[in-house]
Amino acid sequence: MEFVVTLLVTFFAGMGAGLGTGFAGMSAAAVISPMLITFLGMEPYMAVGIALSSDVLASAVSAYTYGKNKNLDIRNGLIMMASVLAFTVVGSYAASLVPSTTMGGFSVFMTFLLGVRFIVRPVMTTKEAMAGVSAKKRAVQSVVCGVLIGFICGFIGAGGGMMMLLILTSVLGYELKTAVGTSVFIMTFTALTGAVSHFAIGGKPDATVFALCVLFTLVWARVAAVFANKASPKTLNRATGVVLVILGVVIMLFNVLT
């Protein structure tokens, strides 16, 4: 019976996380961690480690799918990733100096708001409009935005994927598919760094839960990424919006229940 419960929890956690990753470049930690903590009574630190591990492969397979469909800006993605990683460390150091408050609710609320935004005001930027920005300007923007995202993620400890999607579409004027593709590409490496450090500090995870979460998240992320790359911009905006709103509401309910 215990295995059935584990199977169901990891299946739905992986499904939510995978769809969020494949459609919107959302971090799996936002979905998987609260479910493992609530239903399987797992240690929060371990749950986050498993969620980040699930993120690595799911983000990698999504990035590969987006890249294959020419919806990935690797050059600026690498520039942004360098500043995100560097300033995540600065952000977490700054967070250790101030009184600790849980800011997890902030990222959940942001997920919900971002979902509403995609439904109400779809991102209809085209690749042609993106090409109009000079390479130098885009590189500078990538560094500045990476610093901002990294610092906030390190300080709050969450919301990286959503923050990136928001900034790529709103500030940098990316077309939605390229924004998600670039976001999951960066997240593959940030999640890997996080997962390795979690297990280095916290020890080995529960092998069954770990394997199931990674597998289910990977499968659903692949499904979502394939659909996202075939869909028209309007359909994709709606689908992304709906997925984010549902996930936002579900996670908020979890937080209330626990």
Regions of interest found by a model, annotated:
Residues 18, 48-56, 180-191, 244:
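Transmembrane helix-bundle signature of multi-pass membrane transporters/permeases
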